[in-house]
């Protein structure tokens, strides 16, 4: 279901190194890669994420980033949110927070900005993925998805969408392989754009508004410190669910993390 092809690497000679030194460096890199192969069958997702930080730092030291195999269709992980400083830290931007956290956990990607979407091509636990943050408002997220689908020749089966959910308590995570929009206008826009409900979605709870606070005011306001801690824990859990979905399939991830 998901792209499992390993990312290829574009070789670039580090300044100041002889040919023999470069051979030694690349031998060390290959040894680290072999360790990752061993870990990938035994380690928990957070262990693989720690390894990825080392690998990403090594890639930057060598002056080269992980790149997608041009012939492979990557898994596209889209986090929903509103662009601009005005909306930073608001509940409706939980999807953005998750994408940023994945990028921090798996450094060394190739980042680009387009008219409708920011993207970063990453190697996440041995899988080629595109992390995406739409530059449209949440209610128009489908436009960004259409752009991504065209650029990467992707279909709904290559898509994972991460977004906020009022129907869940703060930090609660739910992963599904398909479903309706649940009243979320961003999801409604995406379903209309791709023409199907058959794609993976991960919801992170932000809780319902209290008192006289309306839904719109709630999602566009910032959570309390206690809520933020719960949401951050939910984001970590969502990332572990994504890694498991990539490595073992979405059904396995649903059984473990729902």
Sequence positions of predicted segments:
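Short, composition-biased linear "edge" segments at structural boundaries
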Residues: 24-34
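Short, charge-rich patches within N-terminal targeting peptides
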Residues: 10-15
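Nucleotide and nucleotide-moiety/phosphate-recognizing core
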Residues: 48-178, 187-203, 209-214, 229-236, ...
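A hydrophobic, small-residue-rich beta->alpha segment in the mid-to-C-terminal subdomain
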Residues: 225-226
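Short, low-complexity intrinsically disordered segments enriched in A/P/G/S/L with frequent Arg
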Residues: 8, 22, 43-49
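Short glycine-enriched, charge-decorated loop/helix-capping segments at active-site entrances
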Residues: 174-180, 219-222
């Amino acid at each position: 279901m998901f792209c499992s092809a390993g990312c290829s690497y574009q070789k670039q000679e580090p300044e100041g190194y002889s040919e023999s030194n470069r051979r030694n460096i690349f031998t060390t890199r290959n040894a680290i890669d072999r360790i990752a192969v061993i870990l990938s069958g035994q380690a928990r997702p957070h262990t693989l994420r720690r390894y990825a930080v080392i690998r990403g730092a090594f890639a930057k030291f060598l002056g080269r980033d992980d790149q997608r195999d041009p012939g492979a269709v990557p898994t596209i992980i889209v986090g929903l949110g509103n662009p601009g400083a005005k909306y930073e830290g608001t509940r409706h931007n939980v999807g953005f927070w998750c994408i940023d956290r994945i990028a921090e956990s798996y450094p060394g990607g190739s980042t680009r900005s387009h008219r409708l979407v920011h993207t970063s091509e990453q190697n996440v636990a041995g899988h080629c993925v595109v992390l995406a943050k739409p530059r449209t408002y949440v209610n128009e997220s489908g436009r960004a998805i259409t752009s991504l689908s065209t650029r990467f020749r992707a279909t709904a089966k290559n898509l994972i969408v991460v977004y906020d959910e009022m129907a869940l308590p703060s930090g609660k995570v739910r992963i599904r392989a398909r479903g309706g929009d649940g009243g979320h206008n961003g999801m409604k826009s995406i379903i209309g754009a791709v023409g199907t409900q058959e794609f993976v979605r991960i919801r992170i709870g932000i809780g319902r508004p209290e008192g006289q606070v309306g839904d719109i005011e709630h999602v566009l306001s910032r959570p309390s410190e206690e809520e933020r801690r719960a949401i951050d824990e939910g984001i970590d859990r969502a990332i572990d669910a994504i890694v498991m979905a990539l490595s073992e399939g979405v059904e396995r991830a649903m059984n473990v993390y729902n």
